């Protein structure tokens, strides 16, 4: 803002002078437009509508068009345009769907001229015809474009884009009857204003909404478009089909694009979010901007070159409530700070490294490029004296190939094809993916899936029969035992009745011992015990006991008020039948009279013989509750995902993100998730894993990723007889006048799935061919071939 460079430009006898300057507005600006003499600029927004004079040292407010006591939605502007033939005529697009024209020559304070209320939703764009003084075009969120004759009260024609909303409309500077429109679904349409029934041409320009477009002021047929896919594309519309001739990759969604006057290959862009700067690009050098303006502190909403024949002054409005004039000489040049070296990995692990030839020559002590074969590829071309660049440095590209044994990516492909990310319970997903990783030799990944299963999956209820069977047979198909130890390591008194009979001086109560959730197993037909509320976070635990030497426990971490747990009866198999201690059952019968034990519990508390092969004692309850919150492991899992992403295994990060869903998604910011998703999808598409890529896009909850499947798809059809491309006008070939893809059964055109015989090439609708071959094996076309549907 403090730069004081001055410029004086001669324009048809007059001169534009000024400096880099700004002024504070009363409210954020949504759009700006410049008068044809470049002396005034209009600023419009939801709460501002003013005209400023552009003087040599500052902006001076000339007129406030928001008049009246009551605020009106007609003054809430989404766009504004100043007529380039009549300096008194303006038009605004209101957020309530009203198009308003303003006549600055009216003597009253209220300059409002006409209101057009035909749109049903917000009007995004208004545009005057460049040579016809009374023609105004508008595009709205309702999907319609309307052409108004300012001498009439209603629109003269309506254009339907067959889409959700229109984002931009622009009249062609060179073609009198042509205008372009951009849409939310990524399409660009070209219309003839004389034919409102259908567009002249339509093509998909971007993956996602196309927010802006601009016709080149000199080259007829050059159309620049910008969209949410962070790209600016230049199209040649003079050919039979729209041809992309330039593409510029930006770092954020493109909100505005304007060609720079007197510079054929330069255009200016600003972003819709994230990035507040304004960039001027040379489309021949799409990776580094030629100039950058950094004055704004919030999103830039409108840009306009001050004069159609002056490339030095750029005006901009922003949400930071400032209006700026940028002097091109004061712009920063990122190319001066750019790194001239490049590094990139190939699909199969090859590493490419590009460096300036001068650096290579200096390090190797040799002269510049003289045909040295140590650097296999050199980029060098003859410099055009007319180009604005001061010079082009020749670069040397070295390619390093990986070893055949160490660069294989088969594990990535196998993992992507075999992973299951949805459609099953979480435990099954983790088990399946762990098995896949283990079979591919990725033990750390397999262990990670296993730990995720243990952390987030409840162990569930396991019947005593199944539990004993698993323990006795050594099966690993069930859930792992939470607490287990060998009975052989315990004292001999554990199985006697003295373990149940405690003295009155014992501090542990009988109710804690004979709780309703712990009963002795009588046989395999016993009912399951009630479920435990202990979380699955407990991997190991201690068992309650009377002797410290048998049941070691760290008492420092046990709260005195926490509930105590005892051995569940179903996991208490005895080693042998007790026949010589008759006092045991009597003692239990006495315990049945206790108010702490019900009769049913006493009846089932008999000591039945159990198979001696069952030598493990399992505890389904933790000894004490550690009061861990549900999201105790969230930070750990988040760090684990970032670890895998930083190691380059974005496949694991995305897979876990999809499988766990909301359990972990809330702990990772949206931008990081989007970066992981897009990186993984790019890898999948490089390996031609289209189905897996589509599944990842469908399962993603990121808006920027899920919208990748919402872009329109263009299907090109050739005539089956003369091979001529079919036009978009129908299913009849323009050359041979035959219908394409005729069904051999119903003799109608197949506009959907077409199935054909590989032997005779006849076919038709899928359902028709299937039904035909159910009753006959001969071709329905009558060629005599025996067709078979498999």
Curated annotation (Swiss-Prot):
Zn(2+) 4 binds at residues 762, 779, 783. WD repeats lie at residues 72-112, 118-158, 161-201, 205-245, 249-291, 295-338. It comes from the Eukaryota. InterPro entries: WD40/YVTN_repeat-like_dom_sf (IPR015943), WD40_repeat_CS (IPR019775), WD40_repeat_dom_sf (IPR036322), WD40_rpt (IPR001680), WDR24 (IPR037590). Its EC number is 2.3.2.27. Residues 516-537, 579-607 are annotated as: Disordered. A zinc finger (RING-type) spans 741-790. Zn(2+) 2 binds at residues 743, 746, 765, 768. One of its GO terms (biological process) is cellular response to nutrient levels. The modification Phosphothreonine is found at residue 581. Its main location: membrane. SUPFAM superfamilies: WD40 repeat-like. Phosphorylation at Ser-155 by AMPK in response to glucose deprivation inactivates WDR24 by promoting interaction with 14-3-3 proteins, such as YWHAG, preventing assembly of the GATOR2 complex. Autoubiquitinated; MIOS is required to prevent autoubiquitination. Pathway: Protein modification; protein ubiquitination. The modification Phosphoserine is found at residues 155, 470, 496, 594, 598. Zn(2+) 3 binds at residues 757, 760, 785, 787. This is GATOR2 complex protein WDR24. Zn(2+) 1 binds at residues 719, 722, 733, 736. One of its GO terms (cellular component) is cytosol. It is found in: Lysosome membrane. It catalyses: S-ubiquitinyl-[E2 ubiquitin-conjugating enzyme]-L-cysteine + [acceptor protein]-L-lysine = [E2 ubiquitin-conjugating enzyme]-L-cysteine + N(6)-ubiquitinyl-[acceptor protein]-L-lysine. Gene3D superfamilies: YVTN repeat-like/Quinoprotein amine dehydrogenase.
């Amino acid at each position: 803002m403090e730069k004081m460079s001055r410029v004086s430009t001669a324009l048809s006898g007059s001169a534009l002078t000024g400096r880099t300057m700004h002024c504070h507005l009363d409210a954020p600006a949504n759009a700006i437009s410049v008068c044809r003499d470049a002396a005034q600029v209009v600023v419009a927004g939801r709460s501002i509508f003013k005209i400023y004079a552009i003087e040599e040292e500052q902006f001076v407010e000339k007129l406030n068009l928001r008049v009246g006591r009551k605020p009106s939605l007609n003054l809430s502007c989404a766009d504004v345009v100043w007529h380039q033939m009549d300096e008194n005529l303006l038009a605004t697009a209101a957020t309530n769907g009203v198009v308003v024209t303003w006549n600055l020559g009216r003597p009253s304070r209220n300059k409002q001229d006409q209101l057009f209320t035909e749109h049903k939703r917000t009007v995004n764009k208004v545009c005057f015809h460049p040579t016809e003084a009374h023609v105004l075009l508008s595009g709205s969120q309702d999907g319609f474009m309307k052409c108004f004759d300012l001498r009439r009260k209603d629109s003269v024609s309506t254009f339907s884009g067959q889409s959700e909303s229109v984002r931009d409309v622009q009249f062609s500077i060179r073609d009198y009857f042509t205008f372009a429109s951009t849409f939310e679904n990524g399409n660009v349409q070209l219309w003839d204003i004389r034919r409102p029934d259908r567009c002249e041409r339509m093509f998909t320009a971007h993956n996602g909404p196309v927010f802006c477009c601009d016709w080149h002021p000199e080259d007829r047929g050059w159309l620049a478009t910008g969209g949410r896919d962070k790209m600016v594309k230049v199209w040649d519309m003079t050919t039979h089909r729209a041809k992309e001739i330039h593409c510029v990759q930006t770092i954020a969604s493109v909100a505005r694009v304007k060609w720079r006057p007197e510079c054929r290959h330069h255009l200016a862009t600003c972003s819709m979010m994230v990035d507040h700067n304004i960039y001027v690009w040379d489309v021949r050098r799409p990776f580094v901007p030629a100039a950058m303006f950094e004055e704004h502190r919030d999103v830039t909403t409108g840009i306009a070159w001050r004069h159609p024949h002056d490339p030095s002054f750029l005006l901009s409005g922003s949400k930071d409530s400032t209006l700026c004039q940028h002097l091109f000489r004061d712009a920063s040049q990122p190319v001066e700070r750019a790194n001239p070296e490049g590094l990139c990995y190939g699909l199969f692990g090859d590493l490419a490294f590009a460096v300036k030839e001068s650096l290579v020559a200096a390090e190797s002590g040799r002269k510049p490029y003289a045909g040295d074969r140590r650097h296999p590829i050199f980029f060098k071309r003859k410099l055009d004296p007319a180009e604005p660049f001061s010079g082009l440095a020749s670069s040397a590209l070295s390619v390093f190939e990986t070893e055949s044994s160490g660069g294989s990516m088969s594990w990535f492909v196998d993992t992507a094809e075999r992973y299951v990310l949805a459609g099953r319970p979480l435990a099954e997903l983790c088990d399946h993916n762990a098995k896949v990783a283990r079979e591919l030799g990725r033990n750390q990944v397999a262990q990670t899936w296993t730990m995720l299963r243990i952390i987030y999956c409840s162990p569930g209820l396991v019947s005593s029969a199944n539990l004993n069977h698993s323990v006795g047979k050594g099966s690993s198909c069930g859930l792992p035992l939470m607490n287990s130890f060998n009975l052989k390591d315990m004292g001999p008194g554990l199985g006697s009745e003295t373990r149940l009979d405690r003295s009155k001086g014992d501090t542990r109560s009988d109710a804690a011992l004979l709780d309703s959730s712990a009963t002795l197993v009588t046989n395999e037909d016993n009912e399951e015990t009630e479920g435990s509320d202990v979380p699955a976070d407990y991997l190991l635990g201690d068992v309650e006991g009377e002797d410290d030497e048998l049941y070691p426990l760290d008492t420092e971490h046990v709260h005195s008020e926490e509930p105590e747990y005892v051995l569940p009866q179903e996991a208490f198999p005895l080693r042998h039948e007790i026949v010589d201690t008759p006092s045991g059952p009597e003692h239990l019968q006495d315990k049945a009279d206790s108010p702490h034990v019900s009769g049913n519990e006493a009846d089932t508390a008999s000591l039945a013989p159990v198979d001696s092969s069952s030598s493990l004692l399992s505890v389904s309850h933790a000894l004490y509750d550690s009061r861990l919150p549900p999201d105790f492991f969230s930070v750990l899992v988040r760090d684990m995902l970032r670890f895998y992403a930083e190691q380059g295994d974005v496949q694991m990060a995305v897979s876990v993100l999809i499988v766990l869903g909301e359990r972990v998604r809330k702990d990772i910011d949206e931008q990081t998730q989007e970066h992981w998703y897009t990186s993984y999808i790019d890898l999948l598409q490089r390996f031609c894993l289209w189905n897996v890529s589509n599944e990842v896009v469908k399962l993603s909850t990121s808006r920027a990723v899920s919208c990748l499947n919402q872009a329109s798809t263009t299907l090109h059809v050739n005539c089956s007889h003369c091979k001529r491309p079919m036009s978009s006008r129908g299913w009849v070939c323009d050359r041979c006048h035959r219908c394409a893809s005729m069904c051999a059964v119903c003799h109608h055109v197949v506009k959907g799935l077409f199935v054909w015989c590989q032997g005779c090439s006849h076919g038709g609708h899928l359902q028709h061919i299937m039904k035909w071959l159910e009753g006959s094996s001969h071709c329905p076309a009558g060629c005599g071939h025996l067709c078979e549907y498999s």
